[in-house]
A protein has these predicted regions:
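Residue-level recognition of single "structural anchor" positions
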Residues: 1-278
Length: 278
């Protein structure tokens, strides 16, 4: 029977994962078997999803930015199609909402990039807010119907439309992002402050996610093999981001800035609270 990990070893392993290390990298540095690390990460991630679901409600939020970030499970979409792989494999999108002022990420949704996913995501956002927000999104059409269905007339909603250079995609440096050649803002509903229609903060959060969650880092062989592992990793990242890590702009955690935490959490708190919630 494998030896049970003590809280110190659990904390070290989770800290390493939250700072962007891979499962096998943590195994090499700690001597803890990769399967044990994975089971621990799933338990803590699943538990912290429940903790955050309960904690991040009743939010007095003025401005919210929403966007989606791409990833994949098992194999990319083209490979799944070419090799006729399991339907559980393929592209996956993480829908993210961020409070533009506190920088809190109160909700996210892992799924496809469909109206049904937008509907679930926006519905969860709506139930966490206590007043009329300004919502900024990109030009994805699914947002329009989802926001109208859940918020009705009680929202100020604008979209930011970026036009990219197609020639940038054809350059030899194919991994470089395409050049943005124009940006247009559109009022979709209500009376949003046009100057504050933006997705800059949520796009920056995507960068933070990719830096801190190894399975979303670009151009590596680190990726999720199972949907439940992916979802737990996303939850673990946002627990660390919201509750533990000092945000460079606000000089505290987003949860503290939003009035949902009195002090900095420690990674040990994530482990203990997460395992207790499962």
């Amino acid at each position: 029977m494998p030896k049970k990990l003590d809280i110190e070893k659990k904390t070290i392993a989770i800290s390493m994962l939250c700072e962007g290390n891979s499962i096998r990298g943590v195994e090499r540095m700690t001597g803890i078997h990769r399967d044990t690390i994975m089971r621990l990460a799933v338990r803590v991630g699943d538990g912290m999803k429940k903790v955050q679901d309960e904690l991040f409600t009743g939010l007095d939020t003025d401005r919210v930015e929403v966007d989606e970030v791409w990833g994949f499970i098992g194999a990319k979409k083209a490979t799944v199609k070419r090799k006729a792989l399991s339907k559980d494999y393929g592209d996956v999108w993480t829908w993210v909402a961020i409070d533009a002022e506190s920088k809190l990420v109160p909700t996210w949704h892992v799924g496809g990039r469909t109206f049904d996913d937008a509907y679930v995501f926006i519905g969860d956002l709506k139930k966490r807010l206590v007043k009329r927000p300004q919502i900024s999104a990109d030009a994805l059409k699914s947002y329009e119907g989802a926001i109208e269905d859940h918020f009705g007339a009680n929202v100020d909603y604008g979209s930011i439309i970026k036009t990219f250079s197609h020639t940038a995609l054809e350059r030899p440096q194919r991994y470089s992002p395409p050049e943005v050649i124009s940006i247009k803002k559109e009022v979709k509903q209500g009376n949003p402050d046009v100057d504050k229609i933006s997705t800059s903060y949520v796009e920056k959060q995507h960068h933070t996610l990719r830096m801190h969650c190894r399975r979303l880092a670009r151009l590596t062989n680190a990726f999720s093999k199972k949907r439940e592992n992916f979802e737990a990793a996303i939850s673990l990242h946002y627990a660390y981001y919201n509750l533990v890590k000092t945000h460079g702009t606000i000089k505290c955690t987003p949860a503290m800035e939003a009035g949902k935490a009195d002090s900095f959490w420690k990674v040990r708190d994530l482990v203990e609270q997460g395992e207790a919630a499962v």
